[in-house]
């Protein structure tokens, strides 16, 4: 029921339908571009999504250049025109001891006001009674983070040959998700 669309595509469609559209800017990975309300109404879409990936204030997040940043998990990403591709997996070939030394994001530093804003929006939509309200996941999953932190090849191999590492990594991620 959730929908999103790449920004340039949405802008072209809105212009085609006769709407004014501001210039588009690339979004960070994990941030979902909300479909423009005018487009949702024009297409008679009866769902509205609420939520986003929460970014803790205490993490490794930093911009390195206009097209390069390190996300809250320490994963380096480069904007390649449409997507933010992973260019560095910080835990590739890591050991269990490396997991102990790694700088993990602090879930307790997520701004409570950010969470409350989504709760308010969900309540407003529910009380209006016009749409099905769909919540988005506020954190990434354990499997995808494993692949992104270690690299797909490294992590998939570890699933079969390094159970202690995988269990420890999953415990850390699941503890963050609490």
Language model segments and positions:
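Catalytic cores of TIM-barrel enzymes
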Residues: 1-178
